[in-house]
Regions:
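Nucleotide/pyrophosphate-binding catalytic subdomain
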Residues: 1-234, 387-392, 404, 408, ...
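Short phosphate-binding/catalytic loops that engage adenosine nucleotides
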Residues: 52, 108, 242, 302, ...
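Terminal amphipathic helices with adjacent charged low-complexity linkers/tails
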Residues: 58-66, 246-265, 311
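Structured, non-catalytic alpha/beta "coupling" segments that mediate domain-domain communication
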Residues: 100, 240-241, 245-246
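Short hydrophobic alpha-helical runs that function as membrane-insertion/retention elements
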Residues: 186-190, 244-246, 305-306, 376
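Acidic-aromatic/histidine active-site loop/patch
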Residues: 237
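A conserved regulatory-domain signal marking ACT and ACT-like small-molecule sensing domains
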Residues: 255-416
Length: 416
């Protein structure tokens, strides 16, 4: 039996690299209707005809997951997490079954598998489970029978044998975990955008597509608002050296590679992109220690991002979706706390910042000139993140993108 462990990302080898195994993930817009599902089926059959052993991870059709969540809350104001997982996991299964039918009509063999049937084992946290093990025996058997394997993304089975879901973007994580377990050196992520851009093109029409970014940069981008990839999927890819190729579903464009930083990437432009999010809440807490606070938040599976401590006050941010869990923890600790939902976060990200001291000064000067005063600032070797009023987020993204010349071809921009 092939088994590959993932949590907490131990230093171990996955299966031997297999150039013949291709893992492809298709998002909800790629399988939004029967016509698109048939198009995906054709692409999978073509990939197999090219000599590949094909595994495809599919998301739910269009807005199916949102519709199912809405249905749950129409029945119950606070549905039990276990039952919610049982409900919303069906969307991906529908996509896989339909795709398998389409493949059969094209003259190829296919089998659809749920996350549990595919061997995706998770912890016991419903709604945001983490993959702890991949038991790929059934996938290997199907591939050996020349079948295209369709795996329902976003889901698995817990160590307690309950159906679990992996949280938003969880199909990315499913695909990368399978790529690592199957020894596939590349995982192709098909989406409704042409790759990773220097900013959200909806805010900055002149934003450019990046040919390649490092795992480190992509992790920061994903954690700071870029919705192209889920953070966890990039962590697994980096840990198991799986290259990611983000590609458009309905275009021949080359997309963006996410891979280990190499000498060519070290010569790249100073800044790779400007990201933003309005989906975080900023908390200020007094009356506890950092160790006690963050241990309690971790126990509740709250994903903490920004952390700043000044004297007795601890400031941190967490996803808006984690608001109930976070406030339950804070109330349980008996601390004094306040929360702000009227802030957004804008981040400037680039590997070239490691050896360039002037980025922060330039970013703050640009924001000041636009009349924007950051509420909280945090940094890493390749990121500067500013929490600012939500109403100023769009302006901040535009002026920072322009100031760092991100609308110019990479060869013409400032380099490290």
């Amino acid at each position: 039996m092939t088994t590959t462990q993932f949590e907490p990302l131990p230093d171990l080898a996955a299966a031997e690299p297999s150039t013949g195994t291709l893992v492809m993930k298709f998002g909800g817009t790629s399988v939004a209707d029967p016509e698109k599902i048939t198009g995906v089926a054709r692409r999978l059959v073509e990939a197999q005809a090219g000599g590949n052993r094909v595994v495809a991870v599919l998301s739910a059709m269009g807005h199916t997951t949102d519709d199912l969540v809405r249905l749950a809350y129409e029945v119950s104001p606070r549905p039990k997490p276990r039952e919610l997982d049982m409900l919303i996991s069906v969307g991906e299964r529908i996509s896989c079954a339909l795709a398998a039918m389409a493949i059969h009509d094209l003259g190829a063999e296919a089998i659809s598998l749920t996350g549990s049937q595919a061997g995706i084992v998770t912890d016991t946290v419903h709604g945001r489970a983490k993959i702890v093990d991949v038991r790929a025996r059934r996938i290997h058997e199907a591939l050996d029978q020349d079948r295209i394997v369709l795996v329902a993304g976003f889901q698995g089975v817990s160590t307690d044998f309950d159906i679990t879901t992996l949280g938003r973007g969880g199909s990315d994580t499913t695909a990368v975990a399978l790529a690592a377990a199957l020894g596939a050196g590349v995982c192709e992520i098909y989406t409704d955008v042409e790759g990773v851009f220097t900013a959200d093109p909806r805010l900055v029409p002149t934003a450019l597509k990046l040919h390649a970014v490092s795992y480190e940069e992509m992790l920061e981008m994903a954690a700071s608002g870029a919705k192209v990839l889920q953070v966890r999927s990039v962590e697994i890819a980096r840990s198991h050296d799986v290259k990611l190729h983000v590609r458009p579903s309905f275009s021949p464009a080359d997309g963006t590679w996410v891979r280990e930083e190499d000498d060519r990437m070290l010569e790249k432009a100073l800044i790779s992109g400007v990201t933003h999010t309005r989906e975080e809440t900023l908390y200020r807490v007094t009356g506890t220690t950092a160790s006690q606070l963050f241990a309690a938040l971790a126990g509740a599976s709250v994903n903490v991002d920004t952390i700043v401590q000044t004297g007795p006050e601890i400031v941190f941010s967490a996803p808006v979706d984690d608001r109930d869990a976070t406030t339950d923890v804070l109330d349980g600790l008996g601390v004094e706390w306040s929360a702000r939902d009227d802030l957004g976060k804008v981040s400037v990200i680039g590997a070239g910042m490691k050896s360039h001291p002037g980025v922060a000064a330039k970013a703050f000067a640009v924001l000041a000139e636009a009349g924007i005063e950051p509420e909280v600032v945090t940094t890493s070797p390749i990121k500067i993140a500013c929490h600012i009023p939500s109403d100023d987020v769009d302006t901040a993204v535009v002026v920072l993108h322009k100031a760092f010349e991100l609308d110019a071809p990479e060869a013409e921009r400032a380099h490290a």
